[in-house]
């Protein structure tokens, strides 16, 4: 699981998340996005999936962006990507999360 905070508003952070997802490779697709706003706070949830050849399966990445117009928190967790009866993922989930973290940092979200 990833948790990052920055002095970046929720709308900008959500755009950065979409950009980061787009940079994760040709087998990544943003599956959906939803959001809610109340008073001065917002929450955006973005879901992506990526195909991993090493396991012949998809992993999903669920990202939650929360905060206000001045600061935000990005939290993400990868799931799925298991293979076989024992659900081995051969590091696919960890790689998906770490690749996403790296892309967010490269875009300036620390």
Located regions from the model:
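Acidic pyrophosphate-coordinating catalytic loop
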Residues: 39-40, 52-54
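A conserved amphipathic terminal alpha-helix motif
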Residues: 83-110
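Terminal, regulation- and interaction-focused segments at domain boundaries
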Residues: 1-26, 33
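Beta-strand/loop substructures that line and gate deep hydrophobic ligand-binding cavities in soluble
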Residues: 54-90
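Short, solvent-exposed loop/turn elements at beta->coil junctions and helix N-caps
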Residues: 33-36, 51
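Conserved active-site and cofactor/substrate-binding residues in soluble primary-metabolism enzymes
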Residues: 8, 12, 58, 91, ...
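A common structural junction motif
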Residues: 21-28, 81, 108
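Short, hydrophobic/aromatic-rich segments at coil-to-beta transitions
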Residues: 41-48
């Amino acid at each position: 699981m990833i948790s990052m905070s920055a002095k970046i508003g929720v709308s900008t952070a959500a755009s950065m998340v979409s950009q980061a997802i787009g940079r994760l490779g040709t087998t990544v697709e943003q599956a959906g996005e939803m959001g809610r706003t109340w008073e001065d706070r917002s929450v955006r949830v973005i879901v992506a999936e990526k195909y991993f050849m090493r396991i012949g399966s998809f992993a999903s990445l669920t990202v939650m962006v929360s905060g206000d117009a001045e600061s935000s928190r990005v939290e993400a967790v990868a799931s799925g990507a298991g293979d076989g009866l024992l659900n081995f993922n051969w590091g696919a989930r960890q790689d998906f999360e770490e690749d996403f973290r790296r892309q967010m940092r490269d875009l300036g979200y620390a």
